[in-house]
Amino acid sequence: MSDSVAGDFPPDPLLASGAFISSAGDGTLDSSAKRRPIQGGIGISGSGESVRIGMANGTDQVNHQTESKSRKRAAPGDNWLPPGWRVEDKIRTSGATAGSVDKYYYEPNTGRKFRSRTEVLYYLEHGTSKRGTKKAENTYFNPDHFEGQGSNRVTRTATVPPPPPPPLDFDFKNPPDKVSWSMANAGEEGWIPNIGDVKVQDSVRRDWSTAFTFITSRNPSKVSA
């Protein structure tokens, strides 16, 4: 026979701390019983009996706040664009970011493509693309043309240096009739030009050298074999 005293029952594990079940009534709920929200928990009331369970976990309130924040982030929609602008959503089909959606904005007059709302707003305010961002593209060609292709290779053409300017003091119409060349002394250049018995000055010789380089760079065929 148990030694426990009548009325001394262990706590019900289904009831939260501080909850109770009223002993009034016949222990059943009639058809008029209904649920009603009470502060800090959920209440069930009926004729002759009431049950109150404390469940102040705030789950519904957190879900409502999360939904409100997501709606704020989604607003405003594309109605902020001026009339005529076109919006295109493109889904990535390959790579680590497959499935992601990219949104592009197209300017109606020039067909320029912008990749973000920030770039569009900057363009509308200043009339030019934002510095430090990728230059807006002209999209009159097919935007899908380069999809699936490898990295574009840029062909660079070697820059040809411009020919030297013609000498200022050389008379192309009246060149010397006859020039003789003699070996230079030690410490001088290899050949020294002479007109008759007169040595050509160094400044004139440099003009001749510049004129020769100018002519041969423009007409290589005129160089005698």
UniProtKB/Swiss-Prot annotation:
Expressed in rosette leaves, buds, flowers, stems, mature seeds and roots. Keywords: Chromosome, DNA-binding, Nucleus, RNA-mediated gene silencing, Transcription, Transcription regulation. Pfam families: MBD. Residues 71-146 form the MBD domain. CDD domains: MeCP2_MBD. GO terms for cellular component: heterochromatin; nucleolus organizer region; nucleus; perinucleolar chromocenter; plastid. PROSITE patterns: MBD (PS50982). Residues 25-92 are annotated as: Disordered. GO terms for biological process: regulatory ncRNA-mediated gene silencing. GO terms for molecular function: enzyme binding; methyl-CpG binding. Transmembrane segments: none annotated. It is found in: Nucleus; Chromosome; Nucleus, Nucleolus. PANTHER family: METHYL-CPG BINDING PROTEIN, MBD, METHYL-CPG-BINDING DOMAIN-CONTAINING PROTEIN 6. The methyl-CpG-binding domain (MBD) functions both in binding to methylated DNA and in protein interactions. Homodimer and heterodimer with MBD5. Interacts with DDM1 via its MBD domain. Interacts with NTF2, RPS2C, HDA6 and AGO4. This is Methyl-CpG-binding domain-containing protein 6.
